[in-house]
Amino acid sequence: MEILIFLTIIFILSSVNLSTQYLSNYKNLEFNKNDHLGSSYIWSNHSKFAGLTIFFGDSVIKGFFPVFLSKYILNINNEYIFLYILIIQMIGNNWSIFLKLKGGRGMAIAIGSLLGINFVLALILYGSYLILYFSKFKDGGITWIISLTITAFISIGFSLNVLYCYLACIFLTILKRVTGNQFKFDINIIINRIIYDRDFR
């Protein structure tokens, strides 16, 4: 029962979209709910400082803190608790109940959550992303998927539970990209969304 209550709180917290709160309450601006409303959207279209602040909120408060809380403070005794937390976090963030099942991409919240789950693998994930981004792709969409996949393979040597977390993250990331905030049944668009996280290359 305690786990169910804890996961419900995480789901509600993850569903709070900090970008829309910033736009509607602080800036009093209209926004298109079909956009991927995350920290990168605010960074690119409004304010670098606000984008970083929202990224911190998504990755640390919404992502890392619930995992840290379950591991070191609540001492929840469940073999798959990290997997449950990650899945709930990404579902809440990507398909927010406060935005009619629309939301962000889930990258920031996954960054924080995976750091809490396994520090070493998270560093490998971040390192892979930075190396691939700056040396090869210069594109965050394809770089993120490849980095997650590389780290998932490496995680096999650590723990099956951690592997499941990375596989769940990959699946939910691809699912969000395919469906977007407005699904389009076009094979070229779907492929571009999976690889590049946008409708057109």
Task: Label every PLM stretch briefly.
Residues N28-G38, I97-I109, K138-I146:
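Short, non-helical or kinked segments that cap or interrupt transmembrane helices
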Residues M1-L7, G63-Y84, L115-L121, I154-C165:
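Helix-coil boundary and interhelical linker segments in multi-pass alpha-helical membrane proteins
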Residues T20-S24, I91-L101, L130-K136, R177-N181:
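C-terminal ends of transmembrane helices
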Residues Y22-L52, Q182-R201:
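Cytosolic, membrane-interface loops and tails of multi-pass inner-membrane proteins
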